[in-house]
Design a protein with these regions (language model features):
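Active-site acidic/histidine proton-transfer and metal-coordination neighborhood
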Residues: 29-30, 36, 70-74, 87-189, ...
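Glycine-rich, proline-tolerant flexible connector loops at the mouths of alpha/beta enzymes
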Residues: 46-68, 125-132
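H/E-rich (His + Asp/Glu) clusters that bind or coordinate divalent metals
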Residues: 239, 246, 253, 257-259
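Acidic/histidine-rich catalytic cores of soluble enzymes
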Residues: 12-14, 43, 136, 143-240, ...
Length: 297
């Protein structure tokens, strides 16, 4: 059975849904069904720093089969992973024990992705998160990135840096510094529209010009709303992200996979929030796709 291919053929792109936009109490099947009913093409799984989410990387075969069964029954894939577990165990941590644990998480995440047919992992762009960065942490970060890229190459899984809310890697240009250092076809950039928009105010550089610095290396894009100085839980359409312009630029750069990133915050009508987000984001993406078709013609 071909899962999710219809959307690619009809629209030329795929729009995924961030897992944390739904209640944590839902089963795998319920999450995939909710995404499908709201009009999304796939779900991006979250592997954050909590013990509960990190435990997913240690799943037994029976648990993995539950996920595969849910994907078969719904016709919706878990198409990518947002791996933010490195906040707690950074790849550049000065503590070798934490650094080793971070690399275990990296290897397990790649193996987990391979087992489920997931081809993309978004990496948090931090050398360290809870500590101050130093030359030592940056050196360790680069060294472990090289190893991680080799692991990804072995598994055929693409790694992409998220542009973050901290100065270490809050722009595509900064992410590209490390992509160019590692020089692996399996390490690219997976930016966040909300974070880029906030960074543009800090540095006085347009979001679109910053995105251009990643030409040929942007593997997917998080579509997230933000307001100056605030990076999370901003409803679509109430912030300052120019989704139409970002979508058009991403399309021009060859990006065809997008994820709507937003959070479930207890709203009883969370399914309505999913549907609204799908409509809102597809308006920008469909316009970008139409612009792309006219440009080619």
């Amino acid at each position: 059975m071909s899962i999710g291919m219809g959307a690619i053929m009809k629209k030329g792109y795929q729009l995924g849904l961030y897992e944390k936009s739904m209640p944590v109490t839902l089963t795998w099947c319920e999450k995939l069904t909710a995404a499908k009913d709201a009009g999304f093409d796939y779900v991006e799984m979250s592997i954050d720093e909590t013990d509960e989410k990190l435990a997913r990387l240690e799943m037994k075969a029976e648990e993995m089969d539950e996920i595969r069964t849910a994907m078969r029954r719904t016709g919706v894939m878990f198409g990518s992973i947002c791996l933010s577990g490195h906040r707690k165990y950074p790849l550049g941590d000065p503590d070798p024990v934490k650094r080793t644990r971070g690399m275990e998480i990296m290897e397990n995440a790649i193996d987990f992705a391979v087992a489920l047919g997931i081809r993309t992992i978004q990496l948090a762009g931090y050398d360290v998160y809870y500590d101050e960065g130093t030359d030592e942490t940056r050196t360790a970060f680069v060294g472990n990135l090289r190893v991680a890229a080799q692991m990804a190459a072995r598994g055929g899984v693409q790694l992409g840096f998220e542009t973050m809310e901290t100065a270490f890697m809050d722009t595509v240009e900064k992410a590209m510094y490390y992509v160019d250092l590692v020089r692996s076809p399996y390490l690219g950039v997976y930016p966040d529209s909300g974070n880029l928009t906030n960074a543009s105010l800090i540095y006085g550089k347009s979001v679109l010009d910053d995105m251009e610095t990643g030409r040929g290396h942007i593997i997917a894009l998080h579509l997230k709303e933000s307001v100056p100085g605030k990076y999370r839980e901003i409803p679509f359409g109430t912030g300052h992200v120019d989704f139409a312009a970002v979508a058009k630029k991403a399309w021009a750069l060859g990006v065809r996979r997008y994820v709507g990133e937003f959070w479930y915050t207890g709203n009883a009508d969370w399914k309505g929030d999913l549907s609204f987000a799908n409509t809102f984001l597809r308006r920008a993406l469909d316009a970008a796709a139409e612009w792309g078709r006219k440009t080619i013609c």
